[in-house]
Amino acid sequence: MKIALALFLLGTVPAAAGFKSPESLVRNVYAYYGSGASELSNGLPRDAEAAGKFFDPALRSAWVAPRHEPYDFLVQSSSWRLGAISISILRRQFDKTYVAVAFDNQGRAVTLNFIVVNGPEGWVIADIESPHDSLRMFLAQHRN
């Protein structure tokens, strides 16, 4: 009886938000760039729900702010047809983990480094670096 009650109570507790590993965080970002259902092929949404799920508090408001971007930073292009995505941990340094991501987008090789932190909600993105820019700088530059 006590076990059944404990299982029932555990079932009523909301599941913890966030991602359990840096790799799962990055995989879930790129799930929005697939070629399946329309809600999963339009890129990462620019709404508060997606911002809260994927980004640290300092980056959330920049992600949802109105702006005119020449391309989607996460795929380095205004359109996409992604090939296989390679995800690997570059290094763990204090509270940050650096995750390398490489893929082919319409015949062009793309490499990005995700800087992720493990916060109270799980793993979230603190910044993303391309060879020429960072997501924070990109969003600030193209803000309205």
How would you describe each model-predicted region?
Residues 112-117:
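Hydrophobic/aromatic beta-strand elements that line small-molecule binding cavities or substrate pockets
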Residues 1-7:
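Sec-dependent signal peptide recognition
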